Amino acid sequence: MLIDFQNLKIVCISLKSSTERRNNFEQMANRLNFKNWSFYDGIVLSDHIEGCAMSQINVLKENMDDTPVLVVEDDIQETEFYKNTIDLSDVTNMDALYLGYSNWAAHPIRAQMSLLSGPSTFIKIKEYYKIANVTSAHAIIYISKKYKQACADGALKYLTDPTGNRHCDVVYAKLQNEYNVFATPKHFFYQNCPRNKIWTNTPIE
């Protein structure tokens, strides 16, 4: 499977009020010549964690098929490693591909803080890394319908799980242990914000 980012469907989750972030994303989309992208107006709730999760869930539900879709957050910035196309032919049955990731849970203590079973793992398979317990949801290509459904269902259930922290990216990190989820060796995107840049602007290799 060849992924062509200029023609791939891309959905950017963004609050309507986030004018600066929207402008920055639109400039990047134009710079990278994205032709099939749109904003999804993020759900505004007093509970920001729930609003974030429900926005992610709704985007997945609106794209519930086996067609790849890149779901991104509005604070992303491309890196020097970005390229217009990637070939996924060498990896069969891929459910999702992370184009950006966080090294937050790479340390056992931080993984424990996020209520994960262990630190992040990365296993090289041909050109990509099979990942588990990797947090973040700022740049993911969802490929299979079954994985989209699992993420949507898991995120919704986790909001009321008394043993969890309710963050949808933690659900996704847990699901990586059950599905064929991979990441690019070099990150194509990072979160260009003070809180997350330190964790997301690092490659796997």
Where are these regions (language model features)?
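An acidic/histidine-cluster motif and surrounding catalytic segment
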Residues: 1-72, 76-205
